[in-house]
């Protein structure tokens, strides 16, 4: 019987790459995303089914705790179990520090931090209910290791995810659950297109130039693609990582060394 994973933000980008890789590893996948993303999620589901695994779409607003609880219940019921949660959903904000508003902070913390907290709580309770030793895998970032200018709000949320990952790992270890995080660098996805465009508005550089400059420091000589990140998540979701918990692992091609 296949194990079951739920991937938040699974309709596109890194979430799609993770879903496809976990399906190749033999997982059935609940693709969780905002209801209006169901059409995009259908493309992810096609990739999962092409790997001969089951897939369902679960409508989820990750900032709503009750919705998160019910989404995990739905995933477990439809797919017949629940073994792994990938807290992948997240947003970026690109603003000078002095222009960040209270509303900006509320929005980015709701999506990037509160949702991770809600997911950890809901997944752990479901693991306990089903009697499984589960795995929770959170989305961090190179910005969880080093703060970046113009990304101050985003950086603080990712530092929060790092601390939460470490704390949750210690609390849930007696139950046999592991909690880890992946920390991508420069990934060629829609989020980085947004970051590049917003930075261009601020510093006047041509579109693509900021992405190029950030990528120039990567030791392996190229920005990453979702498949690079998915490979690490694959390890963290597998039995090969059973003795790994509380870790925030860089997958940045050699940008930061920590």
From Swiss-Prot:
Alphabetized InterPro entries for the sequence: 23BDH, NAD(P)-bd_dom_sf, Sc_DH/Rdtase_CS, SDR_fam
Effect of residue 142 to Q: Loss of L-BD oxidizing activity, and does not gain the ability to use meso-BD as substrate
GO molecular function, one term: NAD+ binding
PROSITE patterns: ADH_SHORT
Record field: catalytic activity: (S,S)-butane-2,3-diol + NAD(+) = (S)-acetoin + NADH + H(+); (S)-acetoin + NAD(+) = diacetyl + NADH + H(+)
Regulation: Slightly activated by Ba(2+), Ca(2+), Mn(2+), Mg(2+), and Co(2+), while Hg(2+) and Cu(2+) cause marked inhibition of the activity. Ni(2+), Zn(2+) and Cd(2+) have no effect on the catalytic activity. Is also slightly inhibited by lactate, pyruvate, succinate, acetate and formate.
Keyword list, A-Z: NAD, Oxidoreductase
EC number(s) reported in the record: 1.1.1.76, 1.1.1.304
Thermal dependence of catalysis: Stable up to 37 degrees Celsius but is rapidly inactivated over 40 degrees Celsius.
Annotated transmembrane regions: none
GO biological process, one term: acetoin metabolic process
Active site residues of this protein: 154 (proton acceptor)
Positions contributing to NAD(+) binding: 12-14, 33, 37, 61-62, 88, 154, 158, 184-189
Pfam family, one: adh_short_C2
pH effect on activity, per entry: Optimum pH is 10.5 for the oxidative reaction with L-BD and 6.0 for the reductive reaction with (S)-acetoin. Stable from pH 7.0 to 9.0.
Function: Catalyzes the reversible reduction of (S)-acetoin to (S,S)-butane-2,3-diol (L-BD) in the presence of NADH. To a lesser extent, can also catalyze the irreversible reduction of diacetyl to (S)-acetoin. Cannot oxidize meso-BD, D-BD, 2-butanol, 1,2-propanediol, ethanol, acetol, 1,2-butanediol, 1,3-butanediol, n-butanol, and n-propanol. Cannot reduce (R)-acetoin, acetol, dihydroxyacetone and 2,4-pentanedione.
Assembly and binders: Homotetramer.
Protein family (similarity comment): Belongs to the short-chain dehydrogenases/reductases (SDR) family.
Name used for this protein in its record: L-2,3-butanediol dehydrogenase
Lineage of the organism: Bacteria, Bacillati, Actinomycetota, Actinomycetes, Mycobacteriales
Gene: budC
